[in-house]
Every structure is written in structure tokens, then in C-alpha cells.
Amino acid sequence: MTITRWLFSTNHKDIGTLDLIFGAWAGMVGTALSLLIRAELGQPGALMGDDQIYNVVGTAHAFVMIFFMVMPIMIGGFGNWLVPLMIGAPDMAFPRMNNMSFWLLPPSLLLLLTSSAVEAGVGTGWTVYPPLGGNLAHAGASVDLAIFSLHLVGVSSILGAINFITTIINMKPPSTSQYQTPLFVWSVLVTAVLLLLSLPVLAAGITMLLTDRNLNTTFFDPAGGGDPILYQHLFWFFGHPEVYILILPGFGMVSHIVAYYSGKNEPFGYMGMVWAMMAIGLLGFIVWAHHMFTVGMDVDTRAYFTSATMIIAIPTGVKVFSWLATLHGGAIKWETPMLWALGFIFLLTVGGLTGIILANSSLDIMLHDTYYVVAHFHYVLSMGAVLAIMGGLVHWFPLFPGYTLHPTWTKIHFGVMFIGVNLTFSPQHFLGLAGMPRRYSDYPDAYTLWNSLSSIGSMISLTAVIMFLFILWEAFAAKREVQTVELTHTNVEWLHGCPPPYHTYEEPAFVQSPQARE
């Protein structure tokens, strides 16, 4: 029974649970790697050895956190669990493909970890730029293993994206318009479209790199008429939509949390929120070269990418102000998910402001590859995506096993985590402005103060992670069952009770229009 249920599962709730557990495990691996980085940088001088091993750790940290923590939890975990419940579908459109989507992840993670363990590891950074990622600078199997790992996780995400798009468009009740689906469903839909359009380009780029390394092609080798800049264009055409893939489901979750704990039936400006997400998704594809301001592009090209990047701030601002408007006049309940959501809104805004600064190509020439960039994207990832995941987890946890997390412990956990991530990443802005470059294992003594503070912050974040494991254990040990859930008519995922039955909506849901009700 256990093998058929968990290995051959075709149930969206079970596969979502597998994704959540896998993501939690990968998150701990990624956290361990990040602590190695911060231990190395806690004071001047070498700890682990040379820059190669340092960069192997940094590269693995990025890949693990992006592809095996954030995406499986947000899209695989919350997406699988909530989308069918929110649209009244009995399951996903392709349940077996859903299972395959998950089971491609563990072998992919194994390949990635193997790539770090053989030869000298992948010391290229997560971008794997040639010629550093080529077979001269990185001889041996490491980079090839990492490329295969990316192929698998890419196939997994593409299959998942096809599944979500089909499910959301085709499996709503017949009378329901797309504009009646909850915002989280919209966010997963936009995310899935981004995945479907961007991942094939990454696959093309890394496949060309694979043949350059092993079959003597010269796609990225000027000696044979190739161009390493081509790889950068292909990579960032995927890489920029990818960062929006990481944050969009978080937008959807935060919209639900803010509305719920403000006692509102719906978020402020539903249509504006939907169109903002679609605008972010579209604009995300036409700004990729802002990662390449230092490779020698024409001034008019730089002007375009600067302007286009700044325009993304407009729909993002629409979302931030709509969340604030949702709070306005609400009967606010200061429960833990609301704290995570408010932290998310504030820190996403800070990360967005540093993003506007980096969008200026003239400024970016100076700030590119400094810790300012690291601070910027960790504000939107380590404090945007992660705070959204934590808020979603605390909010929807009662739905998954049917038990409630401890209200006081989760608030303390929020406080510790919030202090930890801010102490880790705010000093990095000053390091970047002072010119400290990224991807070096050592630094001049002048940078010691901010680095030591940053490393102390990372230790505080570690205590928060351990505390959260205790909170999860406590919930399963105490077995506090859910009593009642408020506002179920606008939060239909709760309608079937906590936890919901194994099969929900076994016959098509009947949706009555608001007009008919009056």
C-alpha cells in the first residue's frame, strides 16, 4: 500500500506532499551550503581552501535553492495541493505526468550533488558561462553532470507547466470564467507559461555547451567562429523569467493571506492584480540583457534595457499598493501568516528599490558582480520567496495534515528569522557600494566588519530553521485538530474540512452566479 500510494501516486494531494517534503529537505541542504559560504566569509583569510571549492559550494547553493527548494515547494507543493481544490477539479489534468514530474527531481538532485563530488566540482557560478564552463577551464565530468541535472529538472518543470496550464484552463466548472478563479491560481498559470517559454531556451544553451565540451563544436568558441556572448543571451533569456517564476506564486499566496487576515472577501483590485501579473510575465521576457551591461553592448541597446527594466516596477507597484489597500479598513488579525505577508511586502519593496538602481546601466557598470547585486537578489529571494513560502506554509498547514501549528512558537520563529535574514543581507549593500566583488573566498581587511555581521545574521537564520523543525514536530506530536475555518465561501480550498478527503470534487462542482443568488 505504501509503495503504490507514494511511489506510483496519481493523487495531486500526495504528489504535493512529496514536493513539500523534498523541498524542505533540499532547503536544508541549500541552507547548509549557504552557511559554508558565510563561515568562509566571516573573517578574512581562508577557511575551506581555494576559490574553486568556494565557488563549487556557491554554485551548488544556488542550484539547490532555486530548482530543488523554491520551485518544488511553490509550484509542486502549493500548486498541486491548492490549484485543483481552488478551481473545483477532481485532480490535475494529467495525474501520471504529475507523478513523473516529481520523480525526475530526486535523480536530478543526485546528479547535481555528484557534480560537486567528482573531479574539482562545478566552480562556475550558477550561470555556467563558457569559457570557464568549457572543457579547458573545467576538464572532467563535473560540468557535464550538472548539465544533465539541469536537463532533468527542466523536463520536470516543463511537464509540470503543461499540466498546470491544461488543468487551469480546462478543468474549471463550465460556467466559471477565468476571471473568477482565485489569484493564486492565476499566479501559477502565469508562472507555468513562463516556464514553458523560457526553459527550452536554457535547454538549447546548455546542450550547445555540452557539445562544445564533448563533441568539438564551437558554438561558444571564437576560434571556430562561435561567440561566448551567445551563451549569455540564451542563459539570461531563461534566467530572467526564472526569477519571476520564483516570485510570482509568492505574489499569489500573499494576496490570499493578506485578504484572509484582513477579513476581506477578496483582495483589492482583483483585475488589476491579474493584469499586473500578466504584465510582469510579459515584461520579464524582454529585459534579459540587463544582466549583461558590462559585456560591451551599444549605448542604445543599454538605454532600451534600462527603460524596459524600470517599467516592470509599475505592475509590481500596482501589486504592492493593492496589498496595502486590501489591509486598509480591514479587521486585521495579527496571526503569524499575516506577519510573514507584511514582512514579504516590505522586503520585496526594498529589494525592488535596489533593483531600480541596478537597472541603470551606467550605475550597473560599477555595481555589477559586487555584493550589491547579491544583496538585491537575496532581498527578493531569501526575503521575498522564502517569506511567502513560510507565510503560505503557516497559513495552509492546517489544510495538509489537519493539525495546527503552535501560534506563539510560529510568531517567535518569524521574529528570529526576520532579524536573521535582514542582518545577513543588509550589510551586503554597503559591501557592494564599497566595491567588494562577488564569488571570491577572501577579501581585504577593510571589509571585515560588514562581513562578520552578515555571517552572524546567517547563524541567526540557522537557529530559525532549526526552530521551525521543532515547530513542525510539535504540531504532529500535539495533534491539535482544526476547529473552524472562516470565510470558506471565498476560500473554497477549505470547504472539504481539514484535512480534505483523499478524493475531492468527484462529480463536477456546481457554481451559482452571484446574480442568481440575489
Curated annotation (Swiss-Prot):
Binding of Na(+), residues: 40, 45, 441
Residues given in the record as heme a3 binding sites: 376
Binding, O2: 244
PANTHER family cross-referenced by the UniProt entry: CYTOCHROME C OXIDASE SUBUNIT 1
Residues at which Fe(II)-heme a binds: 61, 378
Binding residues annotated for Mg(2+), in chain numbering: 368-369
Catalytic activity: 4 Fe(II)-[cytochrome c] + O2 + 8 H(+)(in) = 4 Fe(III)-[cytochrome c] + 2 H2O + 4 H(+)(out)
GO CC terms: mitochondrial inner membrane; respiratory chain complex IV
Family classification: Belongs to the heme-copper respiratory oxidase family.
Name listed for the protein in its UniProt record: Cytochrome c oxidase subunit 1
Molecular function via GO: cytochrome-c oxidase activity; heme binding; metal ion binding
Membrane-protein topology: Multi-pass membrane protein
Origin: domain of life: Eukaryota
Compartment(s): Mitochondrion inner membrane
Cofactor note as given: Binds 2 heme A groups non-covalently per subunit. Binds a copper B center.
